[in-house]
Amino acid sequence: MDILELMKERHSVRQYKDQAIESSKREEINSRINAVNAESKLSIQVFYDEPKCFNSFMAHYGKFENVKNYIAIVGNKNDQEKAGYYGEKIVLKCQELGLNTCWVAMTHGKSKAEIKRGQKLLIIISLGYGETQGVPHKSKSIAELGKADQSTEWFDKGMEAVSLAPTAVNQQKFL
């Protein structure tokens, strides 16, 4: 399946089944995270079978249920864009493996992530087998997202990918 198809299939999921992630899938996720860390210089860490991070008032407020696995993206405070870019590489790998995810900014408890001096926890991604596959949210039209004097196939494909990209509260503030 190509990356655009994965992007079309992927939707945020907040409720998860009580089902462990198989060791073969864990190995693929760990491998992707290691590659991404080497390229990005971020400190992305994955936690399996660790429900405490989402066992808090804020997690319940965010309507998260049965989250036992998560990915913590740690880096310098100015690494937000890198966190999004490289985090989405991992999210799409999870989607390819049949797993569901959700980007989580504030509605979680204390993470077990190791945070070194000068770093901060940038964002968390919940991970597991969803109760559902999530639902698509309304996206802005390509005309609302960008402008080009002449439309080309590569531009249209790129803008389609932009329209599918996750953004905070689905605001899609690209311009």
Protein language model regions, located:
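Acidic, surface-exposed loops and disordered segments
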Residues: M1-L175
